[in-house]
């Protein structure tokens, strides 16, 4: 598999794909980190049947608890186990980094995030209220020994064991530059992809699965 900023993927030149996603220009790296202050970190566990990890997204380099950022959430999959969404929906703010991991490691990662916030904010639950940790998840049991609970509090890449459309899934990112009322803005996105079947792989109306059928056999989707 080869990728060079989208020029070549699975041995297919970008011109063969026959599509372009959107019309807006992207940022310098075409990643969410093009948004000023936003950073992303990964810790990958890759050892035999252990194929998992944790990804952390920090909205800015300062104290997120005291310098909260505006936030919103929208749930389209009633099977998710993300923590912290109720308060985001109620207050419209984010006060911790956002962490991503596998489904059965949400509790461990949430505890690690709480400890991280308490260490940096001794006023939490003393002179202020509690903290709202946000941990997102996907089921990586198709490629990972998820029952082994291998993620510990010391592990701070969630996408290692994910599959998407029967292919290798995981963490992906992009950015777009927009002009609004004479001002320039950078919009970033980070996804943890783990869904769908090979035959459903259609991008911008182009049946990508047909281009790949001769190269990669489809796999059963475990959800």
Which stretches of residues belong to each language-model region?
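A structural signal for small-residue-enriched, beta-sheet-centric alpha/beta enzyme cores
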Residues: 6-223
């Amino acid at each position: 598999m080869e990728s060079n900023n989208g020029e070549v993927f699975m041995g297919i030149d970008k011109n063969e794909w026959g599509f372009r996603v959107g019309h807006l220009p992207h940022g310098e790296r075409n990643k969410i980190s093009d948004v000023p202050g936003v950073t992303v970190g990964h810790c990958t566990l890759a050892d035999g049947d252990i194929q998992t990890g944790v990804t952390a997204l920090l909205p800015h380099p300062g104290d997120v608890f005291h310098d909260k950022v505006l936030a919103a959430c929208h749930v389209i999959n009633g099977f998710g186990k993300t923590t912290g969404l109720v308060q985001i929906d109620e207050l419209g703010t984010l006060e911790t980094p956002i962490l991503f991991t596998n489904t059965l490691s949400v509790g461990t990662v949430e505890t690690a995030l709480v400890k991280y916030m308490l260490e940096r904010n001794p006023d939490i639950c003393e002179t202020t209220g509690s903290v709202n940790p946000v941990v997102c998840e996907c089921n990586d049991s198709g490629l990972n020994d998820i029952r082994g609970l291998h993620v510990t509090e010391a592990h701070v890449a969630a996408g290692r064991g994910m599959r998407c459309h029967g292919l290798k899934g995981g963490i992906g990112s992009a950015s777009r530059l927009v002009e609004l009322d004479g001002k320039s803005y950078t919009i970033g996105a980070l996804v943890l992809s783990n869904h769908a079947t090979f035959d459903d792989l259609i991008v911008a109306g182009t049946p990508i699965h047909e281009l790949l059928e001769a190269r990669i056999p489809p796999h059963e989707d475990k959800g």
